[in-house]
């Protein structure tokens, strides 16, 4: 088990003082550099290929998932037209383009419209389950697999 010492505490302090605790935005911009540096150094320290700072919320989880899938500028991510703002904002924060697809009678992503919205730049889809109703994941996953979409 790895123990956190003075060196690690100093690095954490730098991140906290940067007032940028999460990886939102363009990591090449100065205000995110402490976060990016900490993530890289922490990953090396624990022997991992990557590490991401995040809060425990769903917005951060979406952002982290997109980063983990290597979604970035120029990529398109299909999202349902009826969802919480975090779905599209996570895509924007990754530098990608949210493409809004219609919903069906269950208020979730319409699989047919999802397939119509696919372009060569489409890299991912974020289905959202709404008001206790699940999206048609069998159809959505089948379409995604057919078009090599994450």
What are these regions (language model features)?
Residues 1-59, 63-68, 72, 145-147:
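Conserved PLP-binding active-site segment in aminotransferase class I/II-type PLP enzymes
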């Amino acid at each position: 088990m790895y123990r956190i010492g003075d060196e690690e505490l100093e690095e954490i302090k730098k991140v906290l003082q940067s007032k940028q605790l999460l990886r939102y935005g363009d990591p090449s911009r100065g205000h995110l550099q402490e976060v990016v540096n900490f993530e890289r150094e922490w990953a090396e320290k624990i022997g991992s290929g990557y590490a991401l700072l995040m809060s425990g919320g769903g917005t951060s989880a979406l952002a982290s998932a997109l980063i983990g899938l290597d979604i970035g500028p120029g990529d398109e991510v299909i999202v349902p037209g009826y969802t919480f703002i975090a779905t599209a904002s996570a895509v924007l924060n990754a530098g990608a383009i949210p493409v809004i697809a219609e919903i069906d009678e269950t208020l979730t992503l319409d699989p047919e419209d999802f397939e119509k919205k696919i372009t060569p730049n489409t890299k991912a889809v974020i289905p959202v389950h709404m008001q206790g109703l699940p999206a048609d994941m069998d159809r959505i996953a089948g379409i995604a697999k057919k078009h090599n979409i994450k």
